[in-house]
Regions:
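Bacterial N-terminal signal peptides that target proteins for export
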Residues: 1-6
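C-terminal segment of classical bacterial N-terminal signal peptides
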Residues: 12-20
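Flexible, solvent-exposed loop/hinge segments and secondary-structure transition points
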Residues: 21-162
Length: 162
């Protein structure tokens, strides 16, 4: 009898949790927004005679869009993927991870940490919702950041929490 009551209580509890989760919407990038970020970043790079690998992940750290520009090395493209995934996982810029590694013993060994600038979080236009991440690689880190931010701006989104 006790086991039956416990099983029923567990099932009811699980059903109410699932119902609450179904009602909660998680903000994330759409495929069209990811493409707009890639297009904006590529346009910025071409205007400034730069070559990048560009990666965009959603808020759950799933790859949405990727481009290895003509002439970009395989290594640069792979590094863009790693930077963007790190930002999607940790929800802050890789430049911040660089600072955290220097100031927080052991943080550099945490899963997914990339301590080189170039990965940038993507927020909704009003800065309220974390939507995902974009990263570029192939140029000096600050130029990678500029390109990523240009892509975010071109998509009508924000690189900063507001």
């Amino acid at each position: 009898m006790f086991r039956s009551a416990l099983l029923i209580a567990t099932l009811v509890s699980a059903a109410s949790v699932n119902s609450a989760n179904a009602e909660r919407q998680i903000a994330t990038l759409s495929a069209s927004e990811a493409e707009a970020i890639i297009d904006g970043c590529q346009a910025f790079a071409e205007t400034n005679d730069r070559i990048h690998g560009i990666a965009v992940y959603d808020s759950s750290a799933h790859l949405l869009a990727f481009l290895r520009m003509d002439g970009a090395s395989v290594g640069a493209a792979a590094f863009a993927l790693e930077k963007a995934k790190a930002v999607a996982m940790w929800r802050f810029a890789t430049s911040g991870m660089e600072e955290a590694v220097q100031g927080t013993p052991g943080f550099g060994n945490a899963p997914g940490v990339v301590s080189v600038a170039g990965g940038v979080p993507v927020f909704s236009a009003d800065g309220k919702d974390f939507l995902g991440a974009v990263a570029t690689s192939g140029e000096p880190p600050l130029q990678d950041v500029e390109c990523a931010e240009a892509g975010i701006t071109a998509a009508g989104l924000s690189a900063t929490r507001g």
